[in-house]
């Protein structure tokens, strides 16, 4: 059975987690620290005696800040760092029980699905060497069928198979060497491959779980069947390795370990939580439904049992991180019971011009670096001067101030507009070097920035 340590972030300290997040996200140190501490507390809890461990509840986090400042990006990067079952959901996709749409228990089911998939992949990695050996033997058996005796006798295959002669063993060893050196990759062979019955089933909104169950039922009907296919050895090898790995892993152990991982180390990120908050000065059916979603979320966050196709999970120790812009509402508009379940509040800062400059230059995959690498594929060398970076950041900041503040997402729009013609002409400019300076930026964007009406529609 996979060990619990497979799904914990025990090797990373809060400082290391923050440093890793710093490589991709500019600023927002308070949010990074809170997330890092929460992740480390998962490991700390697992070191406690079992009796005390069950009493230590996770401190859920509510991140508050305008759009485009890094809330969702923190969640995305967290998923790669957590090394634990992790799901990110949009609060707006859920509806109160009785309404058309997803119910909040789907969150628990999605978390278990994620964990089972992760554990299955880990298990397949562990048995891959053995699976490759079995796949190689199956290919050799097709290339060099082994002699058997006892035609018409109902006896065990091991009994009727003759020991290979010295010549056969030598030939098999020769083919094995050719197979491993890649000499036979394009050779066609005919072999039995397991049939995976798949069926597309369209279901109404909110009934996705039923669709999944029906698909699984139909796939089980064809389980165990195989069909003969002609494939090159190169194409057949990965299919056979996958088939052999699936035989070697223990599905029951995977499911049990996945449920354990969800209960002890699971993390749920709920985005756009402010969209299911009732505004203080409005009354209406929509607001009633929004409050209903909060009330449905409450038992999940407090701790309840959720039935999944793999078994029942308890949500008592799952860490919930919620985020929202709260433009038209405020955190105190959440129902009081739910407010109390998110004791850690973190406010993310709006981005300044200086932040935009850092976003364009510091992250490992900064936007400017992305455009440079994309155009390099066409043979165009692109370079940004410091004054160009400064001007791009200034334009993005000004447009955000004049119009809707969409944070760092404004940089995508500005850069795409700035480099539109270059991207269009780049296939015809192979071998050229292009330097983007402040004059280049003003020439392509200056008029748009001066005209507020025009920039409203284009930037």
UniProtKB/Swiss-Prot annotation:
GO terms for cellular component: HslUV protease complex. Belongs to the ClpX chaperone family. HslU subfamily. It holds the Pfam family AAA_2. ATPase subunit of a proteasome-like degradation complex; this subunit has chaperone activity. The binding of ATP and its subsequent hydrolysis by HslU are essential for unfolding of protein substrates subsequently hydrolyzed by HslV. HslU recognizes the N-terminal part of its protein substrates and unfolds these before they are guided to HslV for hydrolysis. Its main location: cytoplasm. CDD domains: RecA-like_HslU (cd19498). Gene3D superfamilies: 1.10.8.60, DNA helicase RuvA subunit, C-terminal domain, P-loop containing nucleotide triphosphate hydrolases. It is found in: Cytoplasm. InterPro entries: AAA+_ATPase, ATP-dep_Clp_protease_ClpX, ATPase_AAA_core, Clp_ATPase_C, HslU, P-loop_NTPase. GO terms for biological process: protein unfolding; proteolysis involved in protein catabolic process. NCBIfam families: hslU, PRK05201.1. One of its GO terms (molecular function) is peptidase activity. This is ATP-dependent protease ATPase subunit HslU. A double ring-shaped homohexamer of HslV is capped on each side by a ring-shaped HslU homohexamer. The assembly of the HslU/HslV complex is dependent on binding of ATP. Keywords: ATP-binding, Chaperone, Cytoplasm, Nucleotide-binding. ATP binds at residues 26, 68-73, 271, 337, 409.
């Amino acid at each position: 059975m996979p060990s619990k340590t497979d799904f914990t972030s025990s090797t990373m300290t809060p400082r290391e987690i923050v440093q890793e997040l710093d490589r991709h996200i500019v600023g927002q140190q308070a949010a990074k620290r809170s997330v890092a501490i929460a992740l480390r507390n998962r490991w700390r809890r697992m070191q406690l005696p079992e009796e005390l461990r069950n009493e230590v509840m996770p401190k859920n986090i509510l991140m508050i800040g305008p759009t485009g400042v890094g809330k969702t990006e923190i969640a995305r990067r967290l998923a790669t760092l957590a090394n634990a079952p992790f799901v990110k959901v949009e609060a707006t996709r859920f509806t109160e029980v009785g309404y058309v749409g997803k119910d909040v228990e789907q969150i628990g089911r999605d978390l278990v699905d994620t964990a089972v998939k992760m554990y299955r992949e880990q298990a397949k990695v562990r048995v891959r060497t053995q699976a490759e050996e079995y796949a190689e033997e199956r290919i050799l058996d097709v290339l060099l069928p082994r002699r058997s005796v006892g035609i018409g006798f109902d006896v065990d295959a091991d009994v009727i198979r003759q020991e290979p002669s010295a010549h056969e063993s030598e030939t098999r060893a020769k083919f094995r060497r050719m197979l491993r050196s890649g000499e036979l990759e394009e050779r066609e062979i005919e072999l039995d491959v397991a049939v995976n019955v798949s069926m597309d089933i369209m279901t109404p909104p909110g009934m996705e779980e039923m669709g999944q169950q029906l698909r699984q039922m139909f796939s089980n009907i064809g389980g165990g069947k195989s069909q003969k296919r002609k494939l090159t050895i190169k194409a057949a090898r990965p299919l056979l390795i996958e088939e052999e790995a699936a035989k070697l892993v223990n599905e029951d152990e995977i499911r049990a370990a996945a449920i354990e991982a969800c209960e002890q180390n699971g993390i749920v990120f709920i985005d756009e939580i402010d969209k299911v908050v009732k505004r203080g000065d409005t009354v209406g059916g929509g607001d009633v439904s929004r409050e209903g979603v909060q009330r449905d979320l409450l038992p999940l966050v407090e701790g309840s049992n959720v039935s999944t196709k793999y078994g029942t999970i308890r949500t008592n120790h799952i860490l919930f991180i919620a985020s929202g812009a709260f433009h038209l509402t405020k955190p105190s508009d959440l129902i009081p019971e739910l407010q109390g379940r998110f004791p850690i509040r973190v406010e993310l800062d709006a981005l300044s011009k200086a932040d935009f400059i850092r976003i364009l230059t510091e992250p490992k995959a900064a936007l400017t670096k992305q455009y440079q690498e994309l155009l390099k594929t066409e043979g165009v060398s692109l370079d940004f001067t410091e004054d160009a970076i400064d001007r791009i950041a200034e334009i993005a900041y000004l447009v955000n101030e004049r119009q809707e503040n969409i944070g760092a997402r404004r940089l995508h729009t500005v850069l795409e507009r700035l480099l539109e013609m270059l991207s269009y002409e780049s296939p015809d400019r192979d071998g050229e070097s292009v330097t983007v300076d402040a004059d280049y930026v003003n020439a392509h964007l200056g008029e748009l920035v001066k005209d507020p009406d025009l920039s409203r529609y284009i930037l």
